[in-house]
Amino acid sequence: MPIRTVMKANEAAAWAAKLAKPKVIAAFPITPSTLVPEKISEFVANGELDAEFIKVESEHSAISAVVGASAAGVRTFTATASQGLALMHEVLFIAAGMRLPIVMAIGNRSLSAPINIWNDWQDSISQRDTGWIQFYAENNQEALDLILLAYKVAEDERVLLPAMVGFDAFILTHTVEPVEIPDQEVVDEFLGEYEPKHAYLDPKRPITQGTLAFPAHYMEAKYLVWDAMEKARKVIDEAFAEFEKRFGRKYQKIEEYKTDDAEIIFVTMGSLAGTLKDWVDKKREEGYKVGAAKMTVYRPFPVEEIRALAKKAKVLGFIEKDISIGLYGAVFIDASAALVNESERPLMLDFIAGLGGRDVTFGQLDDALRIAEEALEKGEVEKPIHWIGLRKELL
């Protein structure tokens, strides 16, 4: 029977890893995700998880260790955040290029400088081009569920790509919420044994992995990574459908909330989706035709789902805790690319909010709504990007 309890998202991630039964875990502690490997090391030490826990001297070594273990043919897991993920950057490309279905938990935290240990999405958003599938959790239950789903998708032979699951620093990592721990037997049936055919250590079947590719072959290798990410779209939908049947919880790449008659729809990710939905309820009571959408899958980018959502809106706004310096927020950039060839598309606005753990308030969302209403009234967007909640007296 499932166990209903309360726990932090870090603990939920550790429980998900335990349920998935990885054989090798390597990690280096970093705020705010330190509790994830700590809890897993307890499971291993207590004999609750039959796995090798490798203590390393850096995050670069942690990801390198799980790359080696995955290349040897076993299920692996790691966790990190912020500068730790940035330090892993070099090896993330290697994991994807070698087609290793590693799963990693990310306690989404801002990047230095200045040093900041609080939440935004800059760390994982900055890895969007590495070839890793990316999921984002709204709450602690989703942190657990999405890690299980990450294994299901990553290990599918049509995909064979690594995956990361992000959940907001402190807002989720250190906050206790109700969580249902699934039954181990059901998880075993859902995931099955990891039996790779492409990468495993066998003296009778010697292979070379991570080898040099000349110009005559390199481009095709990269194409196959891109193609696998494209195939992951269907696999994710299939995994979501099976997960709902087995566990009773429904997931979608983009989850819509009160969008059917909305003129203005705001899109976000992570725990901010909860705030946004509560704010939409308040605005609906005040008579505003506003809706919300939560993006659970960021890579592969949900192109068709964004196009379907855009057809419902007159104004599509993105509330995001990241910034691509030199242009706009990354989610807005990707959504704009997804809609570029559409004959009809809504007015689009980007709102940068909550960087470095700053609270995103109803007042800030009211500011975003005011800007969206002005664009709707004028029928054009004069300025696509707006920083909301900015303390102008400090500039």
UniProtKB/Swiss-Prot annotation:
<dbReference type="GO" id="GO:0006979">
    <property type="term" value="P:response to oxidative stress"/>
</dbReference>
<dbReference type="InterPro" id="IPR033412">
    <property type="entry name" value="PFOR_II"/>
</dbReference>
<dbReference type="InterPro" id="IPR009014">
    <property type="entry name" value="Transketo_C/PFOR_II"/>
</dbReference>
<protein>
    <recommendedName>
        <fullName>Pyruvate synthase subunit PorA</fullName>
        <ecNumber>1.2.7.1</ecNumber>
    </recommendedName>
</protein>
<dbReference type="InterPro" id="IPR053390">
    <property type="entry name" value="Pyruvate_synthase_PorA"/>
</dbReference>
<keyword id="KW-0560">Oxidoreductase</keyword>
<dbReference type="Pfam" id="PF17147">
    <property type="entry name" value="PFOR_II"/>
</dbReference>
<dbReference type="InterPro" id="IPR050722">
    <property type="entry name" value="Pyruvate:ferred/Flavod_OxRd"/>
</dbReference>
<dbReference type="GO" id="GO:0019164">
    <property type="term" value="F:pyruvate synthase activity"/>
</dbReference>
<comment type="subunit">
    <text>Heterotetramer of one alpha, one beta, one delta and one gamma chain.</text>
</comment>
<dbReference type="InterPro" id="IPR002880">
    <property type="entry name" value="Pyrv_Fd/Flavodoxin_OxRdtase_N"/>
</dbReference>
<dbReference type="InterPro" id="IPR029061">
    <property type="entry name" value="THDP-binding"/>
</dbReference>
<dbReference type="Pfam" id="PF01855">
    <property type="entry name" value="POR_N"/>
</dbReference>
